[in-house]
């Protein structure tokens, strides 16, 4: 359904809102009801080139701004974000569909990264060692790279961009942001508040679009580094194409996160934790719990409680505080998820909770879905479904649970529920995952730690946030000096 007040999105280049040089646009839809709420331009390479030139020009002066002054501007930006928390959450729920509770959580996690970026004077400090030889001192200095870019996904339209441009800009770089064409409204709001904070024009530039914009970023010689978050095939493409063009690239990709449930866990808290991790944000997050590997001794009790509690969850428009599961992002994704559920049934998994027909009249909804007796041969175990679909695999012991999780091509996050320090230590040492939780439902690190997975969940060397983020957005100069 097309609404009469649908917003026309614009690019933001060199401090001004400008139309794309391309003629095409894409509908932005509220996934809770299918209404068109905006039109995002499908920009062309010439738009990217304009943005890069603006950023390149701004870099000449921005890189010379004292680091404390950059941090002060970011603090003003932080204050504006804090003042508009509720409005930002409302935009997220409107264009992404996640519940207001989840949207508020996303807003807070994004703000925490800006808080980190305000500490740049400390984070960018170099190293020094006097008297490395007779009368000679050595030191390491950090400098910005130049123009850098970020390509961000639909599922966290606030948090993921804030993983990127605040820290990059704090380090003295200028930035070109390409948000998902499915969730462009929040990106526009982030840019609006950025310039309201007083930043010079051209420091942050916004270009909407699809693959043409992505390729324009990856192949532009003036862009020195690219940050990406999205699906595994696209992450691999971004990494290979970007590095082939001489860029530094971090590409965060897909996931199939496992939670191992031990017999000595706190059963009630474990069940509630897995429900939140599996079905929160409609399962559309790279840190969602996709598989519960449950030790046989507790499996029946676990399933009984899990099924009972999951059936209490309500599905619907994220604006209702009663709803736990919101819509999926688009109809095409909903159909893909339904195909996976059909596949699980055909391959012999036991459908314990069927979310295919929630009592919702419009929108792209699939309710919380649980499969029991899943095996590694099944597609629902192998593939990232990106939906509120949980697979339960029964294992004999911790060793089998770890072996199961490590078979996955993905290695983003993993969790163990246990009261045994020995089991937790074994899990920590043997599991192949970039981010690990012990009785922590979603082991997404705080902003001062790095965020990245292993194997097909991450392409690159340096993750986002924390010290990794500063290293990614800076280059080092090692200075050896002697004075006569």
Swiss-Prot record:
The keyword DNA-binding does not apply. GO terms for biological process: inositol catabolic process; thymine catabolic process; valine catabolic process. Its EC number is 1.2.1.27. Gene3D superfamilies: Aldehyde Dehydrogenase, Chain A, domain 1, Aldehyde Dehydrogenase, Chain A, domain 2. The active site is at 286 (nucleophile). NAD(+) binds at residues 154, 178, 181-182, 231, 384. It catalyses: 3-oxopropanoate + NAD(+) + CoA + H2O = hydrogencarbonate + acetyl-CoA + NADH + H(+); 2-methyl-3-oxopropanoate + NAD(+) + CoA + H2O = propanoyl-CoA + hydrogencarbonate + NADH + H(+). Pathway: Polyol metabolism; myo-inositol degradation into acetyl-CoA; acetyl-CoA from myo-inositol: step 7/7. Keywords: NAD, Oxidoreductase. CDD domains: ALDH_F6_MMSDH. It comes from the Bacteria. It is an enzyme of class 1 (oxidoreductase). GO terms for molecular function: malonate-semialdehyde dehydrogenase (acetylating) activity; methylmalonate-semialdehyde dehydrogenase (acylating, NAD) activity. PANTHER family: MALONATE-SEMIALDEHYDE DEHYDROGENASE. NCBIfam families: MMSDH. Belongs to the aldehyde dehydrogenase family. IolA subfamily. Catalyzes the oxidation of malonate semialdehyde (MSA) and methylmalonate semialdehyde (MMSA) into acetyl-CoA and propanoyl-CoA, respectively. Is involved in a myo-inositol catabolic pathway. Bicarbonate, and not CO2, is the end-product of the enzymatic reaction. Homotetramer. This is Malonate-semialdehyde dehydrogenase 1. The gene is iolA1.
């Amino acid at each position: 359904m097309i609404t009469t007040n649908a917003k026309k999105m614009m690019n933001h280049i060199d401090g001004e809102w400008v139309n794309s040089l391309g003629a095409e646009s894409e509908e932005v839809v509220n996934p809770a009801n299918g209404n068109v709420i905006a039109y995002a331009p499908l920009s062309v390479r010439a738009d990217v080139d304009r943005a890069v030139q603006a950023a390149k020009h701004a870099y000449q002066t921005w890189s010379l701004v004292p680091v404390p002054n950059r941090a002060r501007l970011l603090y003003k930006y932080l204050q504006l974000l804090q003042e508009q928390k509720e409005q930002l959450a409302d935009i997220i729920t409107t264009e992404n569909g996640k519940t207001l509770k989840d949207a508020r959580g996303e807003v807070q996690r994004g703000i925490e990264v800006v808080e980190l970026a305000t500490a740049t004077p400390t984070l960018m400090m170099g190293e020094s060692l006097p008297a490395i030889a007779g009368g000679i001192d050595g030191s390491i200095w950090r400098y910005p790279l130049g123009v850098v870019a970020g390509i961000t996904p639909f599922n966290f339209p606030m948090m993921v961009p804030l993983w990127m441009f605040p820290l990059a800009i704090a380090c003295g770089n200028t930035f070109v942001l390409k948000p998902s064409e499915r969730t462009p409204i929040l990106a526009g709001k982030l840019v609006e508040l950025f310039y309201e904070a007083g930043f010079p024009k051209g420091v942050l530039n916004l270009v909407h679009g699809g693959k043409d914009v992505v390729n324009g970023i990856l192949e532009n010689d003036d862009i020195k580094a690219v940050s990406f978050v999205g699906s595994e095939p696209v992450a691999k493409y971004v990494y290979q194409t970007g590095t082939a063009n001489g860029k530094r690239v971090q590409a965060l990709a897909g996931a199939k996160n496992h939670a191992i449930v031990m017999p000595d866990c706190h059963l009630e808290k474990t069940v509630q934790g897995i429900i939140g991790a599996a079905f929160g944000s409609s399962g559309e997050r790279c840190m969602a719990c996709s598989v519960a590997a449950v030790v046989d001794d507790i499996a029946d009790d676990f399933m009984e409680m899990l099924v009972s509690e999951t059936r209490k969850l309500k599905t619907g428009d994220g604006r209702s505080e009663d709803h736990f599961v919101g819509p999926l992002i688009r109809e095409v994704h909903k159909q893909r998820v339904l195909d996976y559920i059909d596949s699980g049934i055909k391959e012999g998994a036991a459908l314990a909770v069927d979310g295919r027909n929630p009592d919702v009249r419009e929108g792209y909804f699939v309710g919380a879905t649980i499969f029991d007796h899943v095996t590694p041969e099944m597609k629902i175990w192998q593939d990232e479904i990106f939906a509120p679909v949980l697979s339960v695999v029964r294992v004999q012991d911790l060793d089998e649970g770890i072996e199961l999780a490590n078979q996955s091509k993905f290695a983003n996050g993993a969790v163990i529920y246990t009261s045994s320090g020995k089991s937790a230590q074994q899990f920590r040492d043997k599991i192949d995952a970039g981010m690990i939780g012990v009785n922590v439902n979603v082991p997404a690190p705080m902003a001062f730690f790095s965020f990245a997975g292993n194997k097909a969940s991450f392409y690159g060397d340096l993750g986002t946030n924390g010290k990794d983020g500063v290293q990614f957005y800076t280059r080092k100069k090692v200075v050896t000096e002697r004075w006569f």
